[in-house]
Amino acid sequence: MTVAVFLAILCLRAALAAPRPDYSLDAEWEEWKRNNAKTYSPEEEKQRRAVWEENVKMIKWHTMQNGLWMNNFTIEMNEFGDMTGEEMRMMTDSSALTLRNGKHIQKRNVKIPKTLDWRDTGCVAPVRSQGGCGACWAFSVAASIESQLFKKTGKLIPLSVQNLIDCTVTYGNNDCSGGKPYTAFQYVKNNGGLEAEATYPYEAKLRHCRYRPERSVVKIARFFVVPRNEEALMQALVTYGPIAVAIDGSHASFKRYRGGIYHEPKCRRDTLDHGLLLVGYGYEGHESENRKYWLLKNSHGEQWGERGYMKLPRDQNNYCGIASYAMYPLL
């Protein structure tokens, strides 16, 4: 038994010692279970109900702070409502994501628009869900290659995340327990291709590598690490398209994010555990109000956040590590 699983069990056992259920929440609990297709054994229901009620309290507290203008983003009860903090951390990348300061192809006289959303060009595929598998790293890599493939061919083809999970173990990745986008890009480059989701579908678990060269739909010639600053990140995003990034996504507020610009006081720029796709930037309100944000695509399904996307503070000292681990491929 792994330490992470052992801790998760301890958290659930601790929930058993919680007070009896708040019966005033019965209807809300039953509705939440229906909406999220949750079924439990009688004993597990007691445990999950206790965890869920604690999360309800946390969300109410956050909402009250919003009313006092202490926050400017919202959170909500979603499919993760019955999960402990440790269980949610197991869904993120357990690998320590670090990179040396990189270089990228810098073009001169690049015009930087005030706002940018690569979704408007059609080069961003629909949001997908990683489920209970900690493969965010693979989703961000596949998504960045999808965008480059569209820019080159005009075809938006969802690529196989499962191909990356199964076939990068020999590169040091840990399948559903985390992996490094850098080594995933290395695999695609060295392997000479990557399959589509249609021929190598997602299973949310590790299986043996079943890649077949004749089914490959894309190759990458090389990939680049963006220097660790937001100015370089913006220039790369404008010039080359959506970028695979990583942030600190370890907080309960992240898993239950609903909308707005995500300000988490405990978010760190040197603790990176969740991969996303950077697709744009903008600002809320008037430009002079300095409410600037980065726009990111997550892999928790469309029910999470703003239809699967989130906004992260921009030009605020590399908030949550947005510029600490950024890469893009070229075909």
UniProtKB/Swiss-Prot annotation:
Glycans are attached at N72. Gene3D superfamilies: Cysteine proteinases. Disulfide bonds join C133-C176, C167-C209, C267-C320. GO terms for cellular component: endosome; extracellular region; extracellular space; Golgi apparatus; lysosome; nucleus; perinuclear region of cytoplasm. GO terms for biological process: cell division; mitotic cell cycle; negative regulation of mitotic cell cycle; proteolysis involved in protein catabolic process; trophoblast giant cell differentiation. It is found in: Endosome; Lysosome; Cytoplasm, Perinuclear region; Golgi apparatus. GO terms for molecular function: cysteine-type endopeptidase activity. Residues 1-17 form the signal peptide. Residues 18-111 form a propeptide. SMART domains: Inhibitor_I29, Pept_C1. Keywords: Cell cycle, Cell division, Cytoplasm, Disulfide bond, Endosome, Glycoprotein, Golgi apparatus, Hydrolase, Lysosome, Mitosis, Nucleus, Protease, Secreted, Signal, Thiol protease, Zymogen. Its EC number is 3.4.22.-. InterPro entries: Papain-like_cys_pep_sf, Pept_cys_AS, Pept_his_AS, Peptidase_C1A, Peptidase_C1A_C, Peptidase_C1A_papain-like, Prot_inhib_I29. Its main location: other. The active site is at C136, H274, N298. A motif (Nuclear localization signal) lies at residues 33-50. Involved in trophoblast cell proliferation and differentiation probably by affecting mitotic cell cycle progression. Proteolytic activity and nuclear localization are essential for its role in cell cycle progression. PANTHER family: CYSTEINE PROTEASE FAMILY C1-RELATED. Belongs to the peptidase C1 family. This is Cathepsin 7. The lineage of its organism: Eukaryota, Metazoa, Chordata, Craniata, Vertebrata.
